[in-house]
């Protein structure tokens, strides 16, 4: 057996055992948040990254957010060890948003349960619609078509919108240029596809977004670029639900059957955190 194969098997076994332990701890009241439920996961054969590398020369910052920077503070040659100083906002690069990001009476990053960070994944492919309309809003009909093709969506799931906009990841290079800020369309201003408000309500009504769950996307966020009230995000961020933003490599996941897990620092009263996101593929 190749070393890489052994590593994947070991990771899968460790992950499955960890999920069982964490779910049991949450269910017994030992978790940091308000409880949890048992989680049953399949065996996994492959692990993939779903997050971008944070490179200050490449990373596109959301308009108005703190600028990301990396500075070398210590080197092996001079100090005997290497360390960088990181300056960033909580919503830098690939990241998650906690419910308190939009609501003063909801949970923050340090109050979530460990089981909140491990979810079955649903990948909804709207690349064709996005190519025709960069401001496309995924509809209830899109979700129902997914169900017709793949069967019922799991409860408390991570619903990931695959738009293809991550292909244009990079800084803003000025008006009229091909960039992440317009999903490669060359249009001026801010343009990206997202979920329609009706589709988010449908996911909640169906229990796909239940006590747990999230909306994820390979854009700046779940909201269409022309929705400056962020209604889709606001509706999602309640109870133990998240949004995952600036994802990449969604083509590596099957439409159904994979799981995702992610993590970052647990800042006190954090509104979210930059995250490394993993796709776990059966």
Language-model region placement:
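Bacterial N-terminal signal peptides
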Residues: 9-18
């Amino acid at each position: 057996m190749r070393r890489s194969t052994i590593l994947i098997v070991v990771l899968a076994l460790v992950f499955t055992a960890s999920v069982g332990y964490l779910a049991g701890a949450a269910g017994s009241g030992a978790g940091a948040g308000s409880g949890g439920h048992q989680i049953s996961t399949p065996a996994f054969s492959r692990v993939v990254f779903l997050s971008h590398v944070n490179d200050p020369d490449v990373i596109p910052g959301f308009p108005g957010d703190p600028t990301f920077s990396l500075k070398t503070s210590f080197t092996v040659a001079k100090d005997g060890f290497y360390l960088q100083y990181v300056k960033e906002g909580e919503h830098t690069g690939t990241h998650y948003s906690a419910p308190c990001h939009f609501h003063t009476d909801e949970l923050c990053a340090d109050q979530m349960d460990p089981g909140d960070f491990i979810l079955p994944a649903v990948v909804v492919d709207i690349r064709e619609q996005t190519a025709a309309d960069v401001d496309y809003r995924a509809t209830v009909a899109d979700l129902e078509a997914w169900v017709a093709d793949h069967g019922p969506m799991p409860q408390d799931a991570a619903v990931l919108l695959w738009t293809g906009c991550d292909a244009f990841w990079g800084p803003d290079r000025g008006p009229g240029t091909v960039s992440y800020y317009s999903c490669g369309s060359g249009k001026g201003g801010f343009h990206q596809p997202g979920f329609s408000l009706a589709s988010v309500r449908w996911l909640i009504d169906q229990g796909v977004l239940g006590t747990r769950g999230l909306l994820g996307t390979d854009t700046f966020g779940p909201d269409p670029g022309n929705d400056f009230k962020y209604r889709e995000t606001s509706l999602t961020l309640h109870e133990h639900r998240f949004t995952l933003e600036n994802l990449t490599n969604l083509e590596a996941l099957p439409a159904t059957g994979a799981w995702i897990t992610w993590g970052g620092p647990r800042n006190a009263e954090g509104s979210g955190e930059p995250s490394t996101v993993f796709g776990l593929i059966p």
